[in-house]
């Protein structure tokens, strides 16, 4: 009962967050295509400086959101992954097989489609990872519109798949989207990680020391050339889940505290800051460029083929079973919903094509918004139709 109650609360929060993300993205599109566009762009380009002694970090507001606030989002992802691995849906190998296979297919096929369409354009190939991402809040938000017509097992399947997908995105960012490395900063970051691990081993359960060293780690990683958001994941993996004296779990306490701030503050703010695509000069021909086409087709078709195809193979070979109470039509609908890349795709896109420094910076958003929109609409329609059929057969 506690597990179901926890999942219900989590699902409700993710669903509400998904709807808020949609509103934030629509608002950004409206403002950036109105007479107030100067205010929108001027606000995001506002320089913000943080200085302590000789240490100075100067970035426009947009990068403080993408590098700073999103580190808290990745901290939350890291906490969720650690909890799921130690005592949740990822704790038993048998529970990982189906969503794990689906997640792998959902990353490989979109990347291959994007590569195929852009193989003759080396600068554009830097965006290969953009369509590999799934926005868990947005996808669960759409699925929530179907209510009890969708079995809980299918919602758990989507949630677990998305968590594994997020873990894959973390690995991709660490390996493929890091800049020129600073040896000194990496050494200092290593010292911070060593201190965090030592505190974990010594049984330190107070969150304060972890957060202070985590902030220092973020600065070191930011200066090192590795993307700063990875500091959040590293910090999460060092926060203890269990305690020796039956005290409240530090990991669960931090996860509980962060969740509403990330879901209803950071992610909508990120969507508002990054989804404001200017439609000036955009024509139907713009969507035929291989970058937006590769992203949109990768999200809509690549995710569907990859997730559904690997799920079908896993079930037909007998290494996994369909989620209890679900039919193949519902699985197909969920596979299509996995093509809602949105915030995660926008984030990877900001790394692949930096705003203001790449000719593809606007094109990637065209592909992300188009692919995500069609994935949401078609995925909802397919899942709804399959759920009606399932309920009819059951009655």
Curated annotation (Swiss-Prot):
- GO cellular component entries: plasma membrane
Q: Which GO terms describe its biological process?
A: regulation of pH
* Keywords, alphabetical: Antiport, Cell inner membrane, Cell membrane, Ion transport, Membrane, Sodium, Sodium transport, Transmembrane, Transmembrane helix, Transport
UniProt cross-references to Pfam families, sorted A to Z: Na_H_antiport_1
Q: Which domain of life is it from?
A: Bacteria
Question: What residues form the membrane-spanning segments?
Answer: 11-31, 61-81, 96-116, 127-147, 156-176, 179-199, 202-222, 264-284, 295-315, 331-351, 366-386
- Please explain the role this protein plays, according to its UniProt record: Na(+)/H(+) antiporter that extrudes sodium in exchange for external protons.
Q: What is this protein called?
A: Na(+)/H(+) antiporter NhaA
The beginning of the lineage is: Bacteria, Pseudomonadati, Pseudomonadota, Gammaproteobacteria, Pseudomonadales
